[in-house]
Amino acid sequence: MVLIDFRYLFNVEYALTPKDEYPDYETYETDLFSKLLNRFVSIANEYYSSYGKCVLAIDDHTKRYWRKAFYPLYKINRLNLFSLDDKKNNISDEIEQAWLKIIPILRNTKIVPLEISGAEGDDLIAVLAKSPERHLIVSVDKDFIQLLDENIDILSPKTGEITRAEDINGSISAIMDDHILNGDASDGIPSIYAYRKPSDSFSLWFKKKFKTKLTEDVYFRLMTQTPEAELLYKSDILNEYRDNIGFYNDSETFFSTILERELSVKRIPLSYKIERNVKNSVENGFDRSKIFAKDKFLSYNYRRNQRLIDLRYVDTNIVKRVISAFETYRREYGDIKAFCSKYQIPISEIK
């Protein structure tokens, strides 16, 4: 089975197709989707003989992923917290809405479009790759390295190179463990060593905000049950900064620009203390289980990251629905001549 990471290819073609180079929006949209669809068709045809049918793994377009329900700060770092100009995002949303109208048409082709409520494309690929046949994952996402085995290969659409399990230096399980320990900054997943103890800045903020002392037990409950407190902390500090430098409502846009350039989130006082000795003891320790048994924060943080990063821990409800959707999928056979003509797809190659 050829398993295409839709989101990556979509983002690449979107970035390489600047709207301002087209005379009108309709021409722009048509050309963007023409390039995208022809790329899918090319991949499906090139690797069919070796890997079989092609599945397009599509993220839930509402972005209500199960990981966000499990950990509210998941991918929160991808939001623009400062910009007041949403024009660029609206263009993207417009394109995404247009794409949703194409998915039903693809059901009349050899490509299987699959989208499951609450799931990301990674989840779909991880679940379908468990079936006992050869698989080719089409993506540059390094998270898929954990899935490599004798039946699963990875094709980089960027370089055209195929990676197999034997090409990986070192143990895949060791690479996975290191990933869990250190988190994934691109997805907003912190290392297991973060948020063990509050910084002085966070403790003072909490006491001022809630008129009570931040005890060890309260901090543990806060970080494990309502991690969104991190955003509240940052928001209050940013607002205090703005008030202190005397910006007014009519200077919002100017302030936003200054803030984005001069006061990055990285410069906000951390909400937790950095403890390098803890990291050294975990990564160099002979019996990690004993260390975790004595430290409830490390234990919780490790299990949290394992659930978010390790694709063996995809939500069980998602797993069932992916399998059901794939097994009950039925291709349709409507007329797609107009569709192929519009997007310049040879009909013989997509049917």
Locations of the language-model features?
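Residues within well-ordered alpha-helical secondary structure of globular protein domains
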Residues: 131, 150, 225, 260-263, ...
